[in-house]
A protein has these predicted regions:
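Non-catalytic substrate-recognition/targeting regions of SAM-dependent transferases
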Residues: 6-23, 29-96, 103-106
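N-terminal accessory targeting/assembly segments
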Residues: 1-4
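Conserved SAM/SAH cofactor-binding pocket of Class I
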Residues: 106-139
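Single, functionally critical "micro-switch" positions that shape active/binding sites
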Residues: 24-25, 121
Length: 139
């Protein structure tokens, strides 16, 4: 398994009771995560100082509650810059765990010794396409 551990602008700080506390740049967001099944105390101070909290609705979907959070902001991963924005379905426009894949294929592209063309048919956020282009691929 590859772990996306080269982030400086993103981290999962804590998780409990079906939610995770994440740092996206200088902003703290709380979002639901169905894989967080443990019920540990939320003692991390970020739980009380969050900038955004996505509340899941019992009917499906949900809504954000904001506390001093801009409409959008940027974070960096190595030489890549991403614009983030909370969407109505809990996402921010980026999946940081995919950085391990960006590193892997970026290395393959740089070491190929030939022109590389990439057609990303799974370009949900554009992160992989941006990483491939930065590594030298024609996208």
């Amino acid at each position: 398994m590859w772990i996306a551990d080269n982030w400086k602008d993103y981290e999962v700080i804590d998780c409990s009771k079906g939610e995770k506390l994440e740092r996206w740049g200088k902003y703290l967001l709380v979002r639901p995560d169905p894989q967080v099944i443990w019920d540990t105390p939320k003692t991390e101070k970020g739980w009380r100082k969050m900038n955004g909290h996505y509340h899941r609705s019992a009917k499906g979907g949900g809504e954000w509650e904001f506390f001093d959070l801009p409409e959008q902001w940027t974070i960096n991963y190595k030489e890549l810059t991403f614009n983030l924005k909370p969407f109505s379905f809990k996402h921010t426009g980026l999946f940081p765990e995919q950085a391990a894949n960006w590193d892997w294929f970026g290395d393959k592209i740089r070491r190929s010794g030939r022109p590389v063309k990439v057609l990303n048919l799974f370009a949900y956020t554009g992160g992989a396409t941006l990483a491939a282009a930065k590594a030298g691929a024609s996208v």
